Amino acid sequence: MDNKKIIYVDIDGTICENRDDLRQEPGKENAEYEDCKPYYDRIQIINDLYDQGHEIVYWTARGVYSGVDYTELTQRQLNEWKVKHSQLKVGGKPHFDMYICDKSYNAASFFHAKSRGLP
């Protein structure tokens, strides 16, 4: 592929349920990352980008506040969910409420778009 892109993808709330959102549901106040169900339709879209030759890096903020190393769990989930990727980065990601950047996509907008042209 001549126009290979490096694409960073978040995990929670992007390719699987968000643990913090799950905790808002009655009876799920103690939900953990293990309880998050994958969004297979979204995973397939990113897998297609990988198959097209793009480099896919999954980067998660899991453990940023708690200091817990979620690398093993997260890699196991990616394997079980058949997520194709070049690299996994766990931690080291800043926590923020909003990210403004000329190269970012909102997950909902990206996955629900009729056309997904890459820049």
Annotate the PLM regions.
Residues 1-119:
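Catalytic phosphate/metal-binding cores of nucleic-acid and nucleotide-processing enzymes, i.e., regions
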